[in-house]
Design a protein with these regions (language model features):
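Stable alpha-helical elements in mature extracytoplasmic
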Residues: 1, 24-28, 94, 120, ...
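Primarily recognizes the serine-hydrolase "nucleophile elbow" in alpha/beta-hydrolase
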Residues: 1-71, 89
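Hydrophobic anchor at the start of a short beta-strand
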Residues: 17, 105, 135
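A general structural signal for stabilizing positions within well-ordered secondary structure
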Residues: 48, 96-97, 129
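Mobile cap/lid helix-loop segments that gate and shape the active-site cleft of serine hydrolases
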Residues: 62-97, 103
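Acidic catalytic loop of the alpha/beta-hydrolase fold
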Residues: 66, 112-116
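Short beta-strand/loop motif that positions the catalytic acidic residue
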Residues: 101, 106-109, 113
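C-terminal catalytic histidine-bearing segment of alpha/beta-hydrolase fold enzymes
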Residues: 108, 118-175
């Protein structure tokens, strides 16, 4: 998707390309920020003629880790199957894969998430902090899982998108 957008946008205008994903999609967008230098498509005959690095990454209540202590079991099974190796577990545990040039991250989760353990986000935050990656981490006490961009669900998480918009402005991604 990043390649398609970058190769087909109006080059006379400045474009900012961010990626946002929720739950398992949060894992996917974090991978896009971490693995953008890897040309996984070349073996399929698809050649890259642009940067695959997103300008920013927004994982919301994300799956982060494939490690036994944190893994969302269904996500791990869907991604790795049932006969996975330790190397695969480590490769797809994003808290272990953050590069020094990771794009800025806006990370959101709630402690009462009944689907994805919030400690996934805590571990990602620790790694981003350790590597001095520009990021914001919103950790809410309540909000559950699946609140998306909704302001209708109420509670603390209802206004995360307003904080996100402010972050976009402060980081010069939008005016």
């Amino acid at each position: 998707g990043i390649q398609f957008v970058r190769e087909n946008y109006d080059s006379s205008r400045k474009h900012i390309l961010g990626v946002m994903g929720f739950s398992a999609g949060g894992h996917l967008v974090t991978m896009s920020g971490a693995f953008y230098k890897n040309n996984f498509l070349q073996k399929l005959g698809i050649f890259i003629h642009c940067s695959l690095r997103p300008d920013f990454v927004v994982p919301v209540y994300p799956v982060v880790s494939m490690q036994d202590s944190l893994a969302h079991i269904r996500s791990r099974k869907n991604l790795l199957g049932t006969n996975y190796t330790k190397q695969q577990i480590d490769t797809f545990s994003m808290e272990l894969q953050i590069p020094d040039d990771m794009p800025p991250v806006f990370l959101v989760t709630a402690k009462d998430d009944p689907v994805v353990n919030f400690k996934n986000s805590v571990e990602l935050d620790k790694t981003l902090t350790k590597k001095n990656i520009k990021h914001t981490f919103l950790l809410y006490e309540m909000g559950g899982h699946g609140y998306g961009m909704s302001v209708e669900r109420g509670g603390e998480t209802a206004k995360w998108n307003l904080k996100f918009k402010q972050w976009l402005i402060e980081n010069n991604f939008i005016k």
